[in-house]
Design a protein with these regions (language model features):
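Short helix/strand-bridging catalytic loops that position acidic/His residues to coordinate divalent metals
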Residues: 164-171, 202, 232-239
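Active-site-proximal beta-strand/loop segments in catalytic clefts of secreted hydrolases
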Residues: 120, 161, 288-290
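Short, well-structured active-site flanking segments
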Residues: 25, 150-161
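Conserved, well-structured interaction surfaces
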Residues: 39, 43-57, 79-153, 167-203
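Bacterial Sec-dependent N-terminal signal peptides
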Residues: 1-28
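Secondary-structure transition into beta-strands, especially the periplasmic turns and strand N-termini
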Residues: 5, 17-19, 124-139, 245-253
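Short linear capping/connector segments at secondary-structure termini
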Residues: 28-32, 91-94, 160-167
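An aromatic- and glycine-enriched ligand-binding surface/loop that stacks and positions planar moieties
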Residues: 21-82, 156, 180, 188-189, ...
Length: 365
């Protein structure tokens, strides 16, 4: 019995030492508590806030749903009949994936921005100017995501703190007027307190600049002056006039910051296909950037051109067809409406017509 007791004690002691060793491991998962130590980590997290822009549910693929309210294009093409249901036809349901996925993406971006702003002060060795720039970019992106929410849904849940648990997630909606005030305040303040000028960024529009904030502010004021904002209330003529004047004010700031239209309508398209910025006119103020080719861990390549671009065959098995391996292919799912077609034709604008509406498709010889 004594030997048995000694053995049990020895085993317990052994398990105790093993348990202590096991529990003393360094954390292997990233959390706000063990992250935000260096400027590099802060930059990486900020990139994650930007990354929402390139998701397939946003500019990476479904952006055409955001312009579905106009009458310039319709879904069809490549052997498909015109669409008759869904958001693109203005008869979506609450279960439409294009609706729910966009909603989730926007709130994911907002939550990331909230986490970033709550933890940025933990970073050591930060250059003060860089820190201000990062904070301004995060604030702008959060406001931009809220702008997309009120554009699409009006009154929406509103929060400026990150989600810490799975409880208390049913937040009541906030009046869109209050959210508009927040959007404008955040964007204007970001432009003045941290964002770099477009010239300081060498007019590379992948990064948010003062011009970005001013340009989007002009859009916000124009949208706020419309029926969507005034729904449910009577705006005075003075209010509407002020919104349009503010839109003009910010648009003028962009125009005097070194931006102008390219000499040729097609220049930005050629530059984009050449994977370079248009620096001859700095026409592009802000771009959602993409990377990767869908074959690696970096899969943020986007497919807008693949969906709305020139119809062509799958050349993925070909090499050097256009000077490079796998030049890709296009579905041409989005077709021009007769209205847009006639706008070009009736104005005799054949050059822009041929670059905007392809009256042909590419077939492999």
């Amino acid at each position: 019995m004594k030997a048995l007791k000694i053995t049990i004690i020895a085993l317990l002691a052994g398990f105790s030492m093993v348990s202590c060793d096991f529990l003393d491991k360094e954390p292997t998962k990233l959390t706000p508590e063990n992250y935000f130590n260096t400027p590099a980590e802060a930059n990486s997290f900020l990139t994650g806030i930007y990354a929402i822009l390139s998701q397939p549910t946003f500019y990476g693929g479904d952006y055409m749903y955001l312009v579905a309210g106009d009458d310039l294009s319709h879904y069809g093409g490549s052997g498909r009949g015109p669409a008759s249901t869904g958001l693109i036809c203005n008869n979506a349901t609450t279960s439409d994936n294009a609706v729910t996925a966009f909603w989730y993406a926007l709130y994911s971006g907002i939550n990331r921005a909230n986490m970033f702003l709550e933890n940025i002060d933990k970073v050591n060795g930060f250059d003060a100017g860089v820190k201000e720039q990062y904070i301004a970019e995060a604030r702008f992106l959060r406001a931009f995501y809220y702008f997309n929410l009120v554009e699409c849904w009006g009154d929406v849940p509103f929060k400026t703190v990150s989600t810490q648990s799975v409880t208390n997630l049913n937040i009541p909606r906030t009046d869109k007027q209050e959210i508009y005030d927040f959007i404008i305040s955040e964007m204007a303040d970001a432009a003045e307190t941290g964002l770099k000028s477009a010239s300081d960024l060498a007019y590379k529009p992948g990064r948010i600049s003062q011009s970005t904030a001013w340009g989007i502010l002009a859009r916000v004021y124009l949208f706020r002056a419309g029926e969507h904002y005034r729904e449910g209330r009577n705006a005075t003529q003075a209010e509407k006039k002020d919104y349009f004047e503010r839109a003009s004010f910010y648009a003028q700031k962009v125009m005097t910051a070194g931006h102008k239209l390219a000499a040729n309508y097609w220049d930005p398209f050629i530059d984009m296909c050449s994977d370079k910025y248009n620096t001859t006119a700095n026409e592009s103020i802000w771009e959602a950037e993409f990377a990767g080719n869908n074959t690696s861990d970096t899969q943020a390549e986007g497919r807008i051109g693949n969906i709305i671009g020139l119809a062509g065959p799958d050349l993925s098995s070909k090499s050097d067809v256009t000077g490079a391996k796998d030049p890709g292919y296009g579905y041409a799912f989005i077709y021009s409406t007769p209205k847009l077609y006639n706008l070009y034709v009736n104005n005799g604008d054949t050059k822009r017509f041929n670059w905007s509406i392809a009256p042909f498709e590419y077939k492999e010889a």
